[in-house]
Amino acid sequence: MNAKVKITNRAGASFPVRRMNFNFENVPEYWMNGSAGLTHFMTALSALFPAGEQFFIDSVRAVRYHPAIKENEVLQKEISAFIGQEAMHTQEHVGFNASAQKYGHDVARLEQQTDIVIQGFRKTAAMLFKPVGVTQEMIDLMGTTALEHFTATIASQLLINRHIQELMTDETMSTMWYWHAIEENEHKAVAYDVFEGVFGTGVKAYLARCGSLIAAMATLFVVQSYFVLRLLKQDNQLNLKALKDIYVYGYSPSKGIITGMGREMLAYFKPGFHPNHLDTVSLLANWKAKLGL
């Protein structure tokens, strides 16, 4: 593994914080099977993470000492470990994004635009829903729980889909994405448990979380697609081959990472849903053993 790993569990949570230190210096420009399309698809995702992960952390921190959950010692430990993992994800994606920048890909600009989109989404949602009693804290947690469900689901696909794994031809990058995927599934229930602990499980909370998933997925699709096209155009790689590679990787019925997410994404709309109903325990155990995590 091209990373120095330090594993700690000071919080005593059900999962540890792994302090990674990947070296991206020798990552090739088109690190994913030599394909500009595939590489820029994943780089566009990576550009979302620094601002996105910080939003998740801020959303959970804002309510962690709410009277309804502040005495819940188990959940408080999970929150601390969640924050630690998300902070490490931010650090490593910032490192990779900077390495992509050296090839002339303006990922820094995409990181800035991600934050602009998040803040605009927050303000728009507040304008629409505060008059009916939805607080900013609830809006932020709605978005966080929805996006955490997406990240955990796409992460599990990355760990399941052999076709996708075969395309991850650079060891440093594949290890980074597999590590990130493992941790997204380890902490997939934390923001959800915070949301339910603070805002309950009634009809209002159910409608809020379902509506937020629809809005978040629509926004995410538009933003990530724009980022991909921008990266391809800047790189003079906006061509049929790149778009075909992206289609097969992301959206083909039999192999696509996005199309493979359908059942798990729809499960979010079930009354009584909980992220842990989507069992990935054995999957994670196998991958942690494989990577020495």
Where are the model-predicted features located?
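Non-heme di-metal
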Residues: N2-L293
